[in-house]
């Protein structure tokens, strides 16, 4: 389920159903009036943001088990970069038809962020303790940044030249984290 909420008064405008199991990743293409949702069914769901109707639900790769977590868009070239917690790859998908353009071999992934200023994609690998820097044209891994413990979320500076990575501390049900989480700043120039 996706809830459409008014940003001014926080009232519910619409509820979009038929989005699959555990919709986890959301990415908005405001110009195209499309919202893309990834889910645990291994699907890419496309929603029309004017009508709040599901336009398509496409299973991206039937040959393996997938749990797509996050999605980042390159709206200029109609590409979605999608992370997978079940497979050691990031999918590159054409948002116009849901076809897979490439599978980038990297460890199981959590967060993904496209950087149009550098034409790069950044991906966190929580269990591996790494962040991949990927060329968005060739889909080659340019660099692997080792991080402490569990790299989690990603953000960019306004000029696209600095990457921020949140790092979660090791924690379990038996032993909670005792230190605060960290943020790593990576100069990309």
Indicate residue ranges for each PLM-predicted region.
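Predominantly soluble domains enriched in secretory-pathway, periplasmic, or organellar proteins
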Residues: 1-189
